[in-house]
């Protein structure tokens, strides 16, 4: 079902809570804003947050002869979304599955979803390097994974886990497109000045260590958090923000890497 997808990008993080799903959703919206047809696949089975972030909770998944039909965010069908969150009756319901059942579900997401022609498929993964990640890489062997974006925060404890993620990518032959440092500094909602709360430049030093591109540094911006629960892009709502600037840079970087 991935034959019609031109470019597949996996978004990874070594630790949970670094804003990986927010980066995935806003990157998808930014790509759509730039005229691309985009798919967003949420394979974080135990913590699916994409339906909430895009305001799609309660939407139903339908079955057709070719497989599951993803949820579209707009009538023009320029952004398609698939998540186990659409299959749960309540958002609070836990997914209590052992590894084999998780593996089977991820394989079904990657082989039985009817994606139409897409320029990009963004795969939002759970944190770490678990069965889910190995299953994704195995399923993508035939069509190929075109690269990974790694999201981290500047704290040393998060950077340690990202180093493991980098090693995982190298061992599974995934091309690292770059590292995004998230939650670096706090943007005051009143004066928009940025204050470093945690350590800073961890993403830059890590990118230098791994010899991969540093795609940008995102601050904690309360204005971005307000956009959760909608399909509004930062590029539309906050065009002058640092977040919009970094996302635009990432999109331009992807344009230079991939022939769309």
Swiss-Prot record:
GO molecular function: 4 iron, 4 sulfur cluster binding; ATP binding; ATP-dependent FeS chaperone activity; metal ion binding
Binding, ATP: 14-21
Listed PROSITE patterns: MRP
Subcellular location: Cytoplasm
Cofactor annotation: [4Fe-4S] cluster
InterPro entries attached to this UniProt entry: Mrp-like_CS (IPR000808), Mrp/NBP35_ATP-bd (IPR019591), NUBP2/Cfd1_eukaryotes (IPR028600), P-loop_NTPase (IPR027417), YlxH/NBP35 (IPR033756)
Keywords in alphabetical order: 4Fe-4S, ATP-binding, Cytoplasm, Iron, Iron-sulfur, Metal-binding, Nucleotide-binding
Record flagged with keyword Calcium: no
UniProt-annotated binding residues for [4Fe-4S] cluster: 188, 191
Alphabetical GO biological process terms: iron-sulfur cluster assembly
A Pfam entry, by short name: ParA
Gene3D superfamilies: P-loop containing nucleotide triphosphate hydrolases
An example Gene Ontology CC term for this record: cytosol
Cofactor: record remark: Binds 4 [4Fe-4S] clusters per heterotetramer. Contains two stable clusters in the N-termini of Nubp1 and two labile, bridging clusters between subunits of the Nubp1-Nubp2 heterotetramer.
Family as reported in the entry's similarity comment: Belongs to the Mrp/NBP35 ATP-binding proteins family. NUBP2/CFD1 subfamily.
PANTHER family reported for this sequence: CYTOSOLIC FE-S CLUSTER ASSEMBLY FACTOR NUBP2, NUCLEOTIDE-BINDING PROTEIN NBP35 YEAST -RELATED
Purpose of the protein: Component of the cytosolic iron-sulfur (Fe/S) protein assembly (CIA) machinery. Required for maturation of extramitochondrial Fe-S proteins. The Nubp1-Nubp2 heterotetramer forms a Fe-S scaffold complex, mediating the de novo assembly of an Fe-S cluster and its transfer to target apoproteins.
Binding partners and assembly: Heterotetramer of 2 Nubp1 and 2 Nubp2 chains.
Protein name: Cytosolic Fe-S cluster assembly factor Nubp2 homolog 2
Organism per entry: Drosophila yakuba
